[in-house]
Amino acid sequence: MAKGQSLQDPFLNALRRERVPVSIYLVNGIKLQGQIESFDQFVILLKNTVSQMVYKHAISTVVPSRPVSHHSNNAGGGASNNYHHGSNVQGSTAQQDSEETE
């Protein structure tokens, strides 16, 4: 599980540290919005008008409102410049479509 944490933790920590507004999509389709206040191995504390504890197993996607650099130990390499929300092109297209309609 340490390998999975090595991606999650720097990404979530950058979102928390920079107070980036995020949209969190749950596996049941519900969209939550706010800022990541804190997180641990199992939950994310999301703050908006109220704080909500969201279990990670219920999360499908975390979408930042703007790009963040989450590879702090990367010396300017290409990985920190590649901004992806998901593992496929279709997911990125869906996000762009939703941004255009807002």
Swiss-Prot record:
Biological processes per GO annotation: regulation of DNA-templated transcription; regulation of RNA stability; regulation of translation, ncRNA-mediated
Biased composition, class Low complexity, residue ranges: 70-88
Stretches for region Disordered: 63-102
Annotated Sm domain residues: 9-68
Gene3D superfamilies per the UniProt record, alphabetical: 2.30.30.100
Keywords: RNA-binding, Stress response
Keyword Glycoprotein carried by entry: no
One Gene Ontology CC term in the entry: cytosol
Function of the molecule: RNA chaperone that binds small regulatory RNA (sRNAs) and mRNAs to facilitate mRNA translational regulation in response to envelope stress, environmental stress and changes in metabolite concentrations. Also binds with high specificity to tRNAs.
Assembly behavior: Homohexamer.
Cited HAMAP family: Hfq (MF_00436)
Similarity annotation: Belongs to the Hfq family.
Protein name per UniProt: RNA-binding protein Hfq
Source species of the chain: Salmonella gallinarum (strain 287/91 / NCTC 13346)
Gene from which this protein is expressed: hfq
